[in-house]
A protein has these predicted regions:
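Extended substrate-binding grooves/exosites of carbohydrate-active enzymes
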Residues: 2-33, 77, 84, 92, ...
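An acidic-aromatic loop/edge-strand motif
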Residues: 80-83, 87-90, 95-104, 153, ...
Length: 992
């Protein structure tokens, strides 16, 4: 039979596929845990790769596929063929990887032909045989025994074929031609590494001739939650006799009924929620088949623009999750998915958005079992249309949504998502897709969703713009969804009468690299407004391809541009809360503590009363909370204890009283550490940390030690001031305005001259302001000293210096008026007064940089630790005494950038155990100790390319700007910018 091309015809989406149904795997009546009705075809298949679709049909083939296995390679199914060495990886976010010409795709379109054999016996052939593909990117043609059996697209949805009539007794063959791009690819422009192939399970299902084709378990709950009805709508092939049995979670039979429309009634039902994911089980039985279906009962409502779940105002503490693994790509096993979900639970996350496509069908079963609210998203994203003219136009953005050729596909994709996953308790919202604009196709599909399943909420973000004159009809949407909205806009939303729906941020606090730095600001708003349902961090994991290790055993993770591809979007795929290997970023630790289940506030210092608020939605603290408390004075613990009998209802507050007095002098804090009260055999054990509060009661005045007066002299020449005492000799540059040598006890503590420091290796969130910084010359300042005078005065040496920082061809951006006082023991007391050019952007930082011997590898400090901390990202850290090495302090981002700074410090000592450099200040400052210079981290694109400095780099800063989330979110908040017109930096520098 001559081949008929279908993959550029939007009117032909599926050929030979069965009608959509919910996901279930039937069993034989005698089966145990595993089903003998299901035969996995995963494993080794024969494979032939073609660089072009045109190569599939060589000259003389007369348009027929060659199924000869001779000279075919082998490939594992499921997998992505790029991970097997074929084609190449590509990462692009918005831009399509081919010209925008819907519905057409290039003829030079890579393909893969898969072939394997399987056997059928005579008994098998008396039944219905279905062939299922759970995920194939982007489309595929199917042959059974070299007879054409069908065609299907929608990469992340199940395609099921009835192949009964094409089978023979004995050996049979299945052949699949997978095409990299099709007309559907215009709706699959998701922000991810682009891969191809049969990437999810393939299996056969044997079913009796008469069987249950589909069912929809519908639950209703009375207003007072005292009664629930379960009604099952069923569809059949043939007319099997059906019985249905309802079991509780412990396996006790509650009720049995017969008939085609089973109904159950429950008094005082145990309702499902993410904190208590209780599920009943319905067992459907026919003469030859058993189907088990988990059922979670809940009541989802919007009242007065507020989300209620089982009559409770819940909050979504969510993440966006892609199927992504650095080794297996899109192919994700249940064990890999469980690892993600367990990590989420361990970090207080309660919601997942399946961005931007349906995950494997069993993934939602796991979410229902473990307790996650899910935004179940259809396989739709078409934002590449916005780039069709080379720019980024809002009218063009919606072209796919407005183009009638995609009406059928958009309806199909949304229906496939809803129908497949409708029986999962975890589904809170049906999402129509992502970033495709809005148009009649979505309006029609949305109306279908609301009619088919009115029990869930509906979601779509890209609705705020009426493109090309179309007046958006948003009546099918129950929520207002936005992404990366600034906190100020959220405040405006809540008081603007035109907004009447509850708000969710489907993407926020972009977690790329060192960040997010503004999570607490958003969380305060989530807690403030009932109408603000919560948000979903973009995103869960960094996307990368594992490239092995370097000769010195450093992991190689590759991202956009590392594969020679065009177009690409660099490391924009490296934007997760966890590294590709699932090691948590500090951003995940930050988010975990910001969404901690309990928060504290000091009520009365004298009586030791502290108010605790329980932010769990359904669980009393007596069920989950052990509280360990410490009273800290100047970083030392002066009293401590444990409380595990605290009873506070959900959303309520209670007061505890510490049995010990809170000091009244010095730096005083109360540290409250929340941990799991009991074992949870799945997620974590008793004592697992849930978060903490550190209540800063007071910051004591820092006493300035008197300078030691005695023998100290200064000798000047045209270039330097040399300051000498009994045990030291320092050289101060009159051209740079800093010390170039500091010899103490005959040892020069500096391997290179000190430098003024305003630059930081740009974080991913600095990528836009970086251009402004470089234009201002912050990355390459030259120093001009206008005046430098030294004098011996009352047993000390005073150096006064006026200077500026300016880059070549640009005017000065910073003027400094400095005084350095050196006492008889070599202590340097500095007072630096700065004045900025306010026409320039805010500074990354301001401070000084020292280069120390490699042996000076330990930082002992009093500040925020142990994790990297910034003015807007320090909620995973607490104020205290810490000792860490340069390796400990380094956060190894795949793309090197500013990392490892510590905020809120009063003191830091860099030591090798014998010598030491100490900085103290009357005001909080930041420091960093690293093996790498900021110049090295600025120019290198991958962490495995970094070359260590021959010295250790010690930076101490008057102030460091925050990190924010501007890689995709709002510009760094003004309050977190180092944007002061004038400032003063005072510190003491001691060398021992």
């Amino acid at each position: 039979m001559e081949f008929q091309k279908m993959h550029e015809n939007p009117d032909v989406l599926h050929v030979g596929t069965c009608q959509n149904r919910s996901y279930f795997l039937p069993k034989a009546p005698e089966d145990g845990e595993e089903s003998t009705r299901v035969c996995l075809l995963n494993g080794t298949w024969s494979f032939r790769y073609f660089d072009s679709f045109l190569d599939v049909f060589p000259e003389g083939s007369e348009g027929e596929i060659c199924f000869d296995e001779e000279d075919m390679d082998e490939i594992e199914v499921p997998s992505c063929w790029q991970n097997a060495g074929y084609d190449r990886h590509q990462y692009t976010n918005v831009r399509y990887p081919f010209p925008y010409d819907p519905p057409y795709v290039p003829d030079e379109n890579p393909c893969g032909l898969y072939l394997r054999r399987f056997c059928m016996n005579a008994e098998d052939l008396t039944q219905k045989i279905y062939l299922n593909f759970e995920g194939v990117d982007s489309c595929f043609y199917l042959w059974i025994n070299e007879q054409f059996a069908g065609y299907s697209q929608v990469s992340h949805s199940t395609s099921e074929f009835d192949i009964t009539d094409l089978l023979n007794e004995g050996e049979n063959s299945v052949a699949v031609l997978v095409v990299k791009w099709c007309d559907g690819s215009y709706l699959e422009d998701q922000d991810k590494l682009r891969m191809s192939g049969i990437f999810r399970d393939v299996y056969l299902i044997r079913r009796p001739l008469a069987h249950i084709r589909d069912y929809f378990v519908k639950t209703t709950v009375s207003d007072d939650l005292s009664h629930a009805d379960i009604r099952v709508e069923m569809d059949f092939i043939g007319l099997p006799d059906v019985t249905a049995e309802l079991y509780d979670a412990e396996g006790a039979l509650l009720e049995s009924t017969a008939g085609a429309e089973p109904n159950f009634a429950l008094e005082n039902p145990h309702l499902w929620n993410a904190e208590d994911p209780y599920q009943y089980t319905i067992v459907f039985r026919t003469a030859d088949e058993v189907i088990e279906q988990k059922v979670g009962i809940s009541k989802i409502e919007i009242r007065d623009s507020v989300l209620y779940f089982n009559n409770v105002k819940i909050k979504l503490r969510g993440v966006n999750r892609h199927d992504s693994d650095p080794v297996t790509g899109y192919t994700i096993s249940s064990e890999q998915a469980k690892r993600d979900l367990f990590l989420m639970k361990q970090h207080n996350i309660n919601a997942v958005r399946t961005s931007h496509y349906p995950n494997a069908p069993w993934f939602l079963q796991l979410c229902s079992e473990y307790g996650f609210y899910v935004i179940a998203e259809a396989d739709i994203e078409g934002h590449g249309a916005a780039a069709q003219t080379g720019g980024y136009g809002m009218d063009e953005y919606a072209d796919n949504a407005l183009n009638p050729i995609f009406d059928k596909a958009i309806m199909d994709r949304i229906q496939r998502s809803v129908i497949r996953d409708k029986n999962n308790a975890c589904v809170l919202m049906w999402s129509y897709g992502n970033e495709t604009g809005w148009g009649p196709s979505f309006e029609k599909a949305g109306a279908w969703v609301r009619e088919y399943d009115p029990s869930r909420l509906t979601h779509y973000e890209n609705t705020y713009y009426d493109a090309r004159g179309h007046k958006n009809d948003l009546s099918s949407l129950t929520t207002e969804s936005r992404m990366y909205s600034a906190p100020e806009w959220i405040d405006e939303y809540m008081v603007d009468p035109k907004y009447t729906k509850p708000l969710v941020l489907c993407e926020y606090i972009h977690a790329m690299g060192n960040g997010p730095g503004d999570a607490e600001q958003y969380q305060q708003l989530i807690m403030k407004y009932d109408r603000f349902m919560g948000g979903f961090v973009w995103e869960w994991c960094d996307h990368a391809v594992y490239g092995g290790t370097t000769p010195d055993n450093r992991d190689i993770f590759r991202y956009g541009g590392d594969f020679g591809e065009y177009p690409h979007d660099g490391n924009f795929c490296m934007d997760g809360l966890v590294y590709p290997d699932r090691t948590p970023h500090t951003g995940l630790l930050e988010y975990k503590n910001i969404i901690r289940p309990v928060r504290a506030a000091l009520v009365n210092r004298e009586t030791g009363e502290i108010q605790l608020t329980n932010y769990r939605d359904f669980t009393n603290t007596e069920e989950f909370l052990t509280l360990s408390w410490e009273i800290q004075q100047d970083g030392d613990t002066v009293a401590c204890g444990v409380m595990d009998d605290i009873k506070i209802a959900p959303h309520e507050s209670g007061v505890i009283t510490l049995p010990d007095a809170i000091p009244t002098e010095g730096d005083v804090a109360v540290l409250l550490q929340y941990s799991a009260k009991k074992n949870d055999s799945v997620f974590f054990e008793k004592g697992h940390p849930l978060g903490f509060d550190q209540l800063i009661v007071s910051r004591g005045a820092r006493k300035e030690e008197a300078l030691r007066k005695g023998f100290v002299i200064a000798v000047e020449d045209s270039r330097a001031v040399t300051v000498t005492g009994d045990s030291f000799r320092y050289v101060f540059s009159k051209t740079e305005g800093v010390f170039t040598s500091m010899v103490k006890n005959n040892v020069n503590i500096m391997t290179r001259p000190m430098t003024w420091n305003v630059w930081r290796a740009p974080t991913d969130n600095d990528q836009f302001v970086r251009k402004e910084w470089e234009q201002a010359g912050y990355n390459e300042p030259a120093i001009k000293v206008y005046a430098c005078n030294a004098k011996e005065e009352d047993g000390v040496v005073v150096i006064d210096c006026k200077l500026s920082l300016a880059a070549v061809y640009r005017r000065a951006f910073l003027h400094l008026d400095c005084r350095f006082t050196v006492d008889a023991e070599g202590k340097v007391r500095a007072e630096i007064n700065g004045k900025r050019d306010m026409e320039r952007p805010f500074l990354p930082r301001f401070g000084l940089r020292m280069f120390l011997p490699k042996s000076f590898d330990t930082a002992e400090y009093y500040g925020y630790g142990p994790y990297e901390s910034y003015c807007d990202k320090h909620h995973a850290s607490s104020l205290g005494h810490f000792a860490q090495t340069a390796d400990d302090l380094f956060e190894d981002y795949v793309k090197p950038q500013e990392n490892g700074s510590h905020f809120g410090c009063a003191r830091v000592t860099i030591t090798d155990g014998a010598g030491a450099v100490t900085v103290t200040s009357p005001e909080d400052f930041s420091f960093n100790l690293s093996h790498y210079t900021q110049e090295e981290m600025t120019k290198k694109m991958h962490n495995y390319e970094l070359t260590e400095s021959p010295d250790n780099v010690f930076c101490f800063d008057c102030k460091m700007s925050g990190v924010g989330s501007n890689s995709c979110g709002p510009r760094l908040a003004k309050a977190m910018q180092f944007d002061d017109e004038t400032f003063t930096f005072k510190f003491d520098l001691t060398v021992e």
